[in-house]
């Protein structure tokens, strides 16, 4: 019984490094299971008095070892989740970076097109502008044939006023009106 207590104290004093090796946890769990099975199958008369107490200790040891293993798996799962989130974030950043690069290339391409169009159409525009201004100066004494013809706007309030006046309706009788 003293060796069991010493083993329990040693296992509690030497915490298992969960970061390094899960095999240690599996080995410890396996040893404790073997110890429990050996104890249960052993038929020693001297130990029959303490059977309940020893079984409780063995089961407690087994539960502690399984809890340590469970904690290890939980820590691994949280690490995996954190790594997964980092990878997803990196993928999203990469995707946005590619979109920006594509848009920058598109902007550069259209910027070059605008320059090309400007070099092509600017001389035409300047020559047409020069012709237009020289023609307008030559025709300053004559009525400008390029000026727009003035079209009077209808008097909108008087039209609305005429439409809103009451008029007799032949179908409704002499005194009726339609607005």
Curated annotation (Swiss-Prot):
Keywords for this protein: Activator, Coiled coil, Nucleus, Transcription, Transcription regulation
Record has Transcription regulation as a keyword: yes
One Pfam family, short name: Med28
Chief location of this protein within or outside the cell: nucleus
Residues forming coiled coils: 81-119
GO biological process, one term: transcription by RNA polymerase II
Compartment(s) where it occurs, according to its Swiss-Prot or TrEMBL record: Nucleus
GO MF annotations in UniProt: transcription coregulator activity
Keyword match Nucleus: yes
Role summary: Component of the Mediator complex, a coactivator involved in the regulated transcription of nearly all RNA polymerase II-dependent genes. Mediator functions as a bridge to convey information from gene-specific regulatory proteins to the basal RNA polymerase II transcription machinery. Mediator is recruited to promoters by direct interactions with regulatory proteins and serves as a scaffold for the assembly of a functional preinitiation complex with RNA polymerase II and the general transcription factors.
Protein name: Putative mediator of RNA polymerase II transcription subunit 28
